């Protein structure tokens, strides 16, 4: 696990330097290089983005981590922590997206997951063994809504901002495909899978510190069943960010899990 973590977390300065060198090389190769046009999401994000200095980023990261540890229900602090600590991991995720056709389509389309963009009435008509039907059932059983995710504000690059947005909006879809509820045990288990799958520091933090808050009975179940299952799935599962979930509604959920390398925990 440590090797995977180290592999994912390349120094941010080095990554920025490599990208800058590539950009300079491309500029030399063409006399009049044209900037890549911004799409609707990127234009809107740049209007609403809050620019912060490196010191402010460090201060926000430290403050939000303490606040999130003291009160895990402070979703605003958890969101801030993700943005101020996750940039390097997001660059790695962007590379992963660009390495697959499905990921490239996501970055081109930039789909959003809201009640205004998903036809939930249609999903309710799907057979019960489809991914779409399972997603609707998950939302109803756990009384959650896809409209509750906080907007990204502190990332500099709009593409990274979309990836963080995508991660947040797909969180319930990950719960669905993993067959995990939104209780503390389920959240901690999902955070481990997400941490190993994405490399996002906030996921590691949520997994480690979330487990500390488990009650004794929950902790026994966590150590005996949930943690081994989560670590195994996190290491084995294919990258989840490049999955175009909205194109998979009609897919049999068991086939989808098999394709992604996911096994469901037997909670009996």
UniProtKB/Swiss-Prot annotation:
Localisation: Mitochondrion inner membrane
Enzyme class: lyase
Any one GO CC term of the record: mitochondrial inner membrane
Catalytic activity annotation: a 4-hydroxy-3-methoxy-5-(all-trans-polyprenyl)benzoate + H(+) = a 2-methoxy-6-(all-trans-polyprenyl)phenol + CO2
Highest taxon, organism lineage: Eukaryota
Pathway listed: Cofactor biosynthesis; ubiquinone biosynthesis
Cofactor: Zn(2+)
GO biological process, one term: ubiquinone biosynthetic process
Principal subcellular localization: mitochondrion
Keywords for this protein: Lyase, Membrane, Metal-binding, Mitochondrion, Mitochondrion inner membrane, Ubiquinone biosynthesis, Zinc
Entry membrane topology: Peripheral membrane protein
Similarity field: Belongs to the COQ4 family.
HAMAP family in the cross-refs: Coq4
Assembly: Component of a multi-subunit COQ enzyme complex.
Protein name in the entry: Ubiquinone biosynthesis protein COQ4 homolog, mitochondrial
Organism, as annotated: Drosophila melanogaster (Fruit fly)
Lineage start: Eukaryota, Metazoa, Ecdysozoa, Arthropoda, Hexapoda
């Amino acid at each position: 696990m440590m090797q995977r973590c180290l592999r994912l977390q390349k120094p941010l300065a080095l990554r920025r330097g490599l990208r800058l060198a590539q950009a300079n090389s491309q500029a030399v190769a063409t006399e009049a290089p044209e900037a890549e046009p911004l799409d609707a999401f990127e234009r809107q994000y740049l209007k609403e983005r809050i620019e912060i200095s490196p010191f402010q980023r460090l201060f926000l990261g430290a403050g939000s981590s303490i606040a999130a540890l003291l009160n895990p229900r402070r979703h605003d602090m958890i969101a801030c922590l993700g943005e101020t600590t996750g940039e390097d991991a997001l660059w790695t995720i962007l590379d992963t997206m660009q390495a697959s056709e499905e990921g490239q389509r996501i970055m081109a389309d930039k789909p959003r997951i809201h009640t205004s963009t998903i036809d939930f009435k249609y999903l309710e008509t799907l057979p019960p063994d489809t991914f779409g039907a399972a997603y609707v059932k998950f939302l109803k059983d756990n009384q959650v809504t896809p409209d509750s995710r906080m907007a990204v504000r502190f990332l500099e690059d709009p593409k990274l901002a979309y990836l963080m947005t995508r991660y947040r909006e797909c969180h319930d879809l990950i719960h669905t495909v993993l067959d995990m509820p939104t209780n503390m045990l389920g959240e901690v288990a999902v955070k481990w899978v997400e941490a190993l799958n994405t490399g996002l520091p906030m996921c590691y933090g949520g997994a480690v510190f979330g487990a500390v808050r488990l009650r004794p009975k929950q902790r026994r179940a966590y150590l005996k069943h949930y943690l081994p299952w989560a670590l195994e799935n996190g290491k084995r599962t294919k990258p989840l960010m490049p999955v175009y979930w909205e194109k998979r509604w009609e897919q049999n959920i068991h086939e989808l899990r098999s394709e992604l390398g996911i096994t469901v925990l037997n909670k009996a």
